[in-house]
Amino acid sequence: MAEVVHGPVADPGAVLALVAEAQAADGIGPLSEQFRLGVAGPGPHVVAEGGYAGIVIPPAGGPGAVEAVVAPSHRGRGLGRELVATALDVAGAGATVWAHGDLTPARAVAARLGLTPVRTLLNLRRPLADLDPAPSAPDGVTVRTYAGPADDTALLAVNNAAFAWHPEQGGWGPEQIAERTGADWFDPAGLFLAIGSGSGSDEADGRLLGFHWTKVADPATGLGEVYVVAVAPEGQGRGLGRLLTSVGLHYLADRKLDTVELYVEGDNAAALHTYTKLGFSEHERHVAYAHS
């Protein structure tokens, strides 16, 4: 029977082992990074023998989000439906549940609970061989790498302005930066900042206009990631997104990685156009479901 836990789960390692078991069976991870990090957090969580559901409720309020996993040995018994239904009740009105890979069993659970798709997130990939040369920076802009915590305030400002609409990427605070710069995968040499170096009113010397945060997602398989690309409103329309993305791709290629991935909203036509021109194509599809 599913149990709601308000506080840390008893054995986070066992939950992560369950996640790894499901990923090996399905070929795709059942929990996103945010939810994997949250396994060791204060919750709320929904736990059961052979299953787990994480719940994220935004600090500023608004609809929560749910992700769930069921061990291969416990499937076909209604456990997934029980976990998701319980977690959605805790998450509150308007909450969504993510189906990573949008696999058939997840779609079946959604249908039984009367949920319909409300959002699609695409995983795009491309090989890191045969990259086009990185474009030159426009006049009045230089690109450098992360210099440490002194850059954090500007990073947060640009991130939150660029992603004010985004339910996960927007609304970051110092804790989100610290959590990621403290992660094992973080490399300051892979965080690229576009800095205004002109004298115009919209690009005073030293102003951060955009950044590209890269990630070595899986060194064992040679997979890198375009983790975050953000351009400040005053930097848009100048090709900075393409410039920063290209610089980061060359950095990942120099790390001897084979492939790079990124995530983009399925309805973000402008970003999809840019990434398609950069040689990316769809690899995975992730769908959020909610009550109509």
Curated annotation (Swiss-Prot):
NCBIfam families given in the database record: mycothiol_MshD
Purpose: Catalyzes the transfer of acetyl from acetyl-CoA to desacetylmycothiol (Cys-GlcN-Ins) to form mycothiol.
Positions contributing to 1D-myo-inositol 2-(L-cysteinylamino)-2-deoxy-alpha-D-glucopyranoside binding: E33, E168, K215, E225, Y263
Keywords: Acyltransferase, Repeat, Transferase
Residues binding acetyl-CoA 1: A68, V69, V70
Database matches in CDD domains: NAT_SF (cd04301)
Entry's EC annotation: 2.3.1.189
This protein's name: Mycothiol acetyltransferase
Transmembrane intervals: none
Assigned protein family: Belongs to the acetyltransferase family. MshD subfamily.
SUPFAM superfamilies membership: Acyl-CoA N-acyltransferases (Nat)
Known partners and oligomeric status: Monomer.
Domain N-acetyltransferase: residue ranges: 2-138, 141-292
Gene: mshD
Enzyme class (EC, first level): transferase
InterPro entries attached to this UniProt entry: Acyl_CoA_acyltransferase, GNAT_dom, MshD_Acetyltransferase, Mycothiol_AcTrfase
Catalytic activity: 1D-myo-inositol 2-(L-cysteinylamino)-2-deoxy-alpha-D-glucopyranoside + acetyl-CoA = mycothiol + CoA + H(+)
One Pfam assignment: Acetyltransf_1
GO molecular function list: mycothiol synthase activity; protein-N-terminal-alanine acetyltransferase activity
BP-aspect Gene Ontology terms: mycothiol biosynthetic process
